[in-house]
Amino acid sequence: MLYNPGVLLAQLFGGQLKSSSSTYPTGTVHCKPQSRTAVVEVTNPITGEIWMDRNLGAEQVAISNTDALAFGDLYQWGRRADGHQCRISGTTSTLSNIDQPLHDDFILVPTSNNRDDWRSPQNNALWQGVAGINNPCPSGFRIPTSAEFTTERQSWSSNNSTGAFNSVLKLPLAGYRERTDGVVSLIAEGSPYGMLWTSTINNEEAIFFAYWSGNAFVNPYPRSRGYSVRCIKN
């Protein structure tokens, strides 16, 4: 299902979908300006939650869980959509001491870094709610919490990547970007993975939501890794 720029279409996909008039934050860098992510709402009929029907940066709703056009971008936790999230963005090893780095590079963090965060010192408020300092979601949307992803998972037909794709969210196996070298990989532990950030922090790390052929779960991980983002309506 393809969308022309500026045209929002809705299609029934197991749940209720409708177009939205939401706009992206000022300064948002779209990795593919000619096909910026359409804002279309999808409602989970079991939980009642309203989500975007695709990942940030995705060109279309996934038609399979390996649909590359549905993968979207890979964000470091807490960063705005400044271009670092583009899968082919440059890299830098210089940590940032401000909330909005003055560049579009993916910030590499060695494993020897005590906090393993792109920002030093850390700021826990960057992605908290619609008013989060660096919330990359369109107006009225935000990064979901760990609890919200857990509730979503519990509504699936199976607790794995099959359940993720068969759900109304049509979640693809979009991979991740490694924090130490900036390499993008679709494979983790020998299997394709889908990994999405939540807004929930856990001490010096943040909670991400992962799913693969064998399981789906939430877990803490260093904030400097690049994961997908799926926005939820506030």
Describe the residue ranges of each PLM region.
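Core domains of carbohydrate- and sulfate-ester-processing enzymes
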Residues: 61, 82-97
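N-terminal low-complexity, intrinsically disordered "leader/linker" segments enriched in small/polar
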Residues: 2-16
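Extracellular/luminal ectodomains of metazoan preproproteins built from arrays
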Residues: 26-28
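C-terminal, surface-exposed recognition/capping segments
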Residues: 15-20, 30, 36-38, 44-84, ...
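Extended terminal accessory/targeting regions
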Residues: 97, 101, 105-107
